Amino acid sequence: MSNTNNIQEEWTEMVEEMNNAVADSMEQNMKAQAAFVESWADAVEDTIPEQDDLADGMDGYNRAYEEWMDAAEQMVERSTDAAQGEDVDPAEFRDIWLQSANEAFKHVMGTSAFAAANGQLVESMMEMQQEADDLSQDTLEQLGFPTRNDVDEIAERLIELERRQHAVEQKLDRVLEHLEE
């Protein structure tokens, strides 16, 4: 019977260890998920426009929409005129849409929301460009080619050597002048 108790105790101990391992794993998983959600929220928060920018953007979008609706009305009017026999130049239709497009783009592109979005885009592109540049410099270094920093350092040394050479030449000229006297 003591053997049965021993097996039962070992079983209980093993199940308890497994439960603890699962609990620890779940706790680590929850921490990782919380960190991910927090990171994601921070990233999303940076992309959400300010309330004023959002309102300005919506206002610009609404004005652009009105431009397109006005253009559609003009197109219907001119189409009706053409259907009633009036001689309508097809270039008028093109001009209506081009004018409307220009005005609509002005309304949208003139908003602070567009400026903010464009600023974020430029910032992201510059970061990507810097990352690509860093990667190319690392690749050059790993392949044994000189990097931009290596070339800059050599250029600085060369300039310093030229400066020193010029100073030595001036001293030599003074010595030669003194010997000639």
From Swiss-Prot:
Biotech utility: PHB and PHBV are desirable bioplastic due to their biodegradability, biocompatibility, and mechanical properties. However, PHBV has better mechanical properties than PHB.
Keyword Nucleus found: no
Alphabetized UniProt keyword annotations: Acyltransferase, PHA biosynthesis, PHB biosynthesis, Transferase
Recorded GO MF terms: acyltransferase activity
InterPro entries registered for this protein in UniProt: PHA_synth_III_E
UniProt entry tagged with the keyword Acyltransferase: yes
EC numbers for this chain: 2.3.1.-
Gene Ontology biological-process entries: poly(3-hydroxyalkanoate) biosynthetic process; poly-hydroxybutyrate biosynthetic process
Pathway noted in the entry: Biopolymer metabolism; poly-(R)-3-hydroxybutanoate biosynthesis
Catalytic EC class: transferase
UniProt family annotation: Belongs to the PHA/PHB synthase family.
Task performed by this protein: Involved in the production of polyhydroxyalkonic acids (PHAs), which are water-insoluble biopolymers used as intracellular energy reserve material when cells grow under conditions of nutrient limitation. PHAs are composed primarily of 3-hydroxybutyric acid (3HB) and 3-hydroxyvaleric acid (3HV). Required for the production of poly-beta-hydroxybutyrate (PHB) and poly(beta-hydroxybutyrate-co-beta-hydroxyvalerate) (PHBV).
Subunit text: Heterodimer with PhaC.
Name used for this protein in its record: Poly(3-hydroxyalkanoate) polymerase subunit PhaE
Source organism of this protein record: Haloarcula marismortui (strain ATCC 43049 / DSM 3752 / JCM 8966 / VKM B-1809) (Halobacterium marismortui)
Gene of this entry: phaE
